């Protein structure tokens, strides 16, 4: 009888040990194979899809839209100090995304933005988004085939955003994410947006800034809110269905998005869109769309456009200002 009790106790002990071992193994697998169960120390704040500067009535106010800086801090400061004459109280600068990554001094560019929040506004480009994703998902290379398991970014109009092609997240994005850290990335998430709108009450003009651009009617027609992917990564749009946008030309129906403004812009004649992103097209100044990515990172030019009211003309003037990059 005593031997039977001992054998039963031994069997129960063995079963308990196996059960505990299975639990530990399961937790190990979930912890290291599911990023949702092992998020970074702190998640980033919700990012605004659109921020507005409303009711601009000050005739002395000037706005400077700046193309892709890509971490070229020296040229950025040359633009501010030498070409613009410094950021006085009457000047607001708007960076059109991709102000970090590739160049040598992304951290300095970010610090400048955060130290001059009242005068320097920013929209996020595809590279800022990729750096933020790299921060949220330090082991990003593991999830290329399972992107839905990644920790997403949160925007005011999209609560679970994951880029369509996460294979674009590189080791360089990961290094920059670690360099900037939570403090600076969270401040950028709060300070920047995906698009910015200026309402110039004096003339009734509306100016938009978005890294990749916008199609006619975005943010102007009820319920026409562009997606984060479009605002950050678009180059083409399906001319038969404007909600379909892409970075590459998918088929013969896809056209450069700004050609829609050339054709249909009269329906929104008081609107202009400033953008970067498309260095292959270079400086691309059209009636209602202003492309300012001139490949500073490739030793070309850093381009910007100053918007200033001319009292004599009774309208806003648009002045191109550029710096040679090296």
Curated annotation (Swiss-Prot):
The family note in this entry says: Belongs to the metallophosphoesterase superfamily.
Species in which this protein is naturally found = Saccharomyces cerevisiae (strain ATCC 204508 / S288c)
The UniProt catalytic activity note for this protein reads: [phosphate](n+1) + n H2O = (n+1) phosphate + n H(+)
Glycosylation sites recorded in the entry for this protein: 90, 241
Name of the featured protein? Zinc-dependent endopolyphosphatase
Q: Does the keyword Iron-sulfur apply?
A: no
Free-text remark on how the cofactor is bound: The yeast vacuole plays an important role in Zn(2+) storing and sequestering. Therefore, the changes in Zn(2+) concentration may regulate the enzyme's activity.
Its needed co-factors are: Zn(2+); Co(2+); Mg(2+)
Question: Which biological processes are named by the entry's GO terms?
Answer: cellular response to phosphate starvation; polyphosphate catabolic process
Quaternary structure and interacting proteins, as annotated: Interacts with PPN1.
């Amino acid at each position: 009888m005593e031997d039977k009790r001992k054998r039963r106790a031994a069997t129960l002990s063995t079963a308990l040990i196996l059960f505990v071992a299975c639990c530990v193994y399961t937790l190990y697998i979930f912890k290291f194979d599911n990023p949702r169960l092992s998020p970074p120390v702190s998640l980033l704040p919700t990012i605004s899809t659109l921020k507005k500067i409303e009711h601009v009535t000050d005739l002395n106010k000037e706005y400077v839209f700046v193309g892709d800086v890509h971490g070229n801090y020296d040229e950025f400061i040359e633009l501010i100090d030498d070409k613009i004459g410094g950021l006085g109280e009457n000047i607001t600068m708007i960076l059109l995304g991709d102000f970090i990554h590739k160049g040598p001094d992304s951290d300095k560019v970010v610090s400048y933005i955060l130290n001059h929040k009242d005068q320097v506004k920013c929209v996020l480009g595809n590279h800022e988004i990729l750096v933020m994703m790299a921060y949220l998902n330090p082991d990003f290379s593991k999830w290329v085939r399972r992107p839905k398991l990644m920790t997403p970014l949160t925007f005011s109009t999209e609560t679970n955003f994951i880029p369509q092609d996460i294979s674009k997240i590189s080791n360089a994005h990961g290094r920059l994410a670690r360099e900037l850290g939570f403090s600076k990335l969270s401040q950028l998430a709060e300070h920047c947006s995906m698009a910015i709108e200026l309402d110039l009450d004096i003339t009734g003009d509306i100016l938009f800034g978005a890294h990749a651009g916008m199609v006619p009617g975005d943010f102007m027609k009820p319920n026409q809110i562009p997606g984060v992917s479009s605002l950050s990564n678009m180059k083409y749009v399906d001319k038969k269905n404007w909600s379909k946008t892409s970075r590459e030309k998918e088929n013969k129906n896809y056209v450069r998005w700004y050609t829609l403004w050339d054709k249909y812009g009269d329906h929104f004649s008081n609107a202009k869109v400033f953008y970067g992103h498309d260095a292959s097209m270079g400086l691309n100044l059209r009636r209602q769309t202003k492309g300012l990515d001139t490949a500073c990172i490739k030793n070309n030019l850093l381009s910007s456009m100053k918007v200033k009211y001319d009292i004599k003309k009774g309208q806003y003037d648009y002045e191109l200002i550029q710096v040679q990059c090296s």
